[in-house]
């Protein structure tokens, strides 16, 4: 080799030279061998030259794998591939990036099937140490110095490509890679991947059964959770009964419910079941649902403190995070444990109080302990009687309205002495009980003795739950030698902002263990009612009750075609900026009636595409103009308005016009609009009603002057949040009544149609801008007339001036005016009403 021209060229150039890279491609394609094997690395000239075998493998050879033809891969190629350097200190493995780049090439033997085979051969902990750490830190976008990573490129492509144009094999390869990417501990990366996966399933639903068969038994619950949450999101756009039946038959219901206890998977399975049931899909296992009412798991066995101490050194980070109230996971993420009682469903007819728990526990102990506890109860009773006697004696001689006696010691000297004697004896009795109880029950004994007189519901033992999570997270394979380096580098408290979405592998195991624990608890213990006013939480129904659903894969709506026709093209009266003003102009602006927009023009919008008119049923607009110069004499100008609407009986309209025109209409809760309680998925509506008590019923106006009239909202409001974060997501949907009465069906872009015509929409779902509710004027006017109903608008807002430099310090003088507008749609389709302004200056 050194003697010929190629050899001389190699001796003079680095492995990254373009010609060397070309040779690394052409030689295996033409001669079925690798360039690196043609070089005599023991030749003196190659020993002393700049070219190095390992560098050639790491650069030119590695590059060639991503561009060579599919027939240029051999066993020798695979051997050299395994020799590519993998710097352990960065946790980035170029070999995985190569496989991701090749993953979608159908004819390539190194496509996603190879990646799949490699990952399946590894046990879950080793796979997380090699693969999950890599994908957690290797998802980044393009910037001035770097091109986008292969992971980001693939996921973004999957989020935009017309999946229907891909072959079935390509769809399977894409889904395979996306599923394996969901094992990451990078939260944002996982969310992007799940959205791309749900989109794939929605556009290629025929492939869902393949992925169910191929991935339901993977030993990584992150992946299985993502699989079924994506399937659920996708099928909510399907109505093909044959397809849904095939999907239902392919799901291993029993195995997932009994062998993979995971409350997130159960939530997705329940959603799939409920949706299928709503369409009368056959082949559904009705005998298994609701899952928590058909127990299938063995009774929980909790490790004790000694069990945790035995493994604490090996899993110290997990123990710190999940094993106490000092760690964020144990304190905050596991807070929902308190929503269950400590009473097993098998032990009683309802959740027991602390008093009942104590009595049952000590009644089961030895006769000596039971006798000691009986004496404690007798002494407790005597103490309470003394307190009652003292209080009664005080009230006989004092006003019954004087509650200060609760804070006074009302006992006489004899009573005080008796109390001291009782307290001394109680301490003796409790110590005697502790001596006779086994050490394993010491903590429980102390808790029960302390709470023996409480009539509050006995909550689930959170410390026991924390120990369970620690033990099971550790048993998933967490080891210091595998993960501590990664966690110290990328998950420490001083990490840069772009790494904040990367979680510890240990936290992944904690999350999985908690999902498992909740599956057990939900079917074995009583739920503790929170006694909310608006929703019924008397029993456990699903994870939405404690905000445990993480993301809504159905929002924004999953588009299942390229159709954009018949979407409204709106021409509307805009009021989204303030004019340039001097200080004098500002004073006039805030006090002038003429600077209020004409709301009759705002609430009716023309549609260029269909010559239709739209009625604006809900909107919120806010505009602010702050002086750029901090020393300017100008004030900050703020302006906002809120548009509400509802329907009333036409016969009631005459009783509402005058009070409506004179009332303050600024309150954000002026009109009650049912919502999804931040946890019902966008596309679960209207088929599934997680909160039946929120169905719209006739409401009464809070304003006293309008309170004689009842109304109903035509809307439902969607927003999203879960236990770890809230989002700005908002959208409007038609009320169930409107859907039923106008026979509306859900469209491609979140719009609602009747007879193939869009009747209701929120333009925010297909174009940038704020969320608004629009309804076809023609359709709504006909509906109102047929049902003797009237549509009214209640609009309120304010204009405000203030000095931003002094406001926070001295609450400087504010110039302020409130305005309102009351409009209604008359029987001829005309908008009528008035608007007014009330000026108010305050300090």
Q: Where are the regions a protein language model picked out?
A:
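Extended charged low-complexity segments that act as oligomerization/scaffolding linkers
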Residues: 2-24, 209-301
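Amphipathic alpha-helical scaffolding segments comprising HEAT/armadillo-like alpha-solenoid repeats
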Residues: 4, 34, 74-83, 96-101, ...
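Alpha-solenoid HEAT/ARM repeat scaffold
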Residues: 93-97, 113, 191, 224-228, ...
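Extended repeat-based interaction scaffolds and adjacent low-complexity, acidic/S/T/P-biased segments
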Residues: 38, 44-46, 51, 76-84, ...
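Extended amphipathic alpha-helical scaffold segments
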Residues: 1, 161-233
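Residue-level signature of the C-terminal ends
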Residues: 9, 13, 25-30, 67-72, ...
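HEAT-repeat alpha-solenoid elements in large eukaryotic scaffold proteins
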Residues: 123, 127-159, 224-228
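HEAT/HEAT-like alpha-solenoid repeats
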Residues: 85, 104, 120-127, 139-140, ...
